[in-house]
Amino acid sequence: MVAPYEIDVEDVEFACPDGVPLLARLYRPRGPGPFPGVVEVHGGAWTMNDRITNHDIHVPLAKSGVVVMSIDFRMPPVAMYPASSVDINFGVRWFKANAERLSVAVDKIGIV
């Protein structure tokens, strides 16, 4: 059995639509990589929760060698459709654009 990775956790701004900073929490295994990566979009019927809601899922994934980016996105009633979808698209694009810096294998990126 492989020992779990030590991880680093940090918040980053990935977009700023209409002057509203959108944050993502990155969970990164320590090591040379590249690692597979996943963008995690929290549940909540598009109206509640945030990037830290599923922390109990993010940590084990990162400790197993997956870079996790859990994102915030605008939600009603503050921002109506399609704002949430647009923000999620920004998050995925940011993750892919920064894959090398984050030690993510660009051909092994998923979304959950």
Predicted regions and their residues:
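Structural cue for short, hydrophobic secondary-structure segments
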Residues: 40-43, 70, 94
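Alpha/beta-hydrolase active-site loop
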Residues: 79-101
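Alpha/beta-hydrolase active-site loop signature
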Residues: 45, 73-77
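Short beta-strand element of the alpha/beta-hydrolase
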Residues: 24, 34-44
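Short N-terminal helix/helix-N-cap motif within the alpha/beta-hydrolase-1
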Residues: 48-52, 78-79
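Short amphipathic alpha-helix adjacent to the substrate-entry channel of hydrolases
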Residues: 50-70
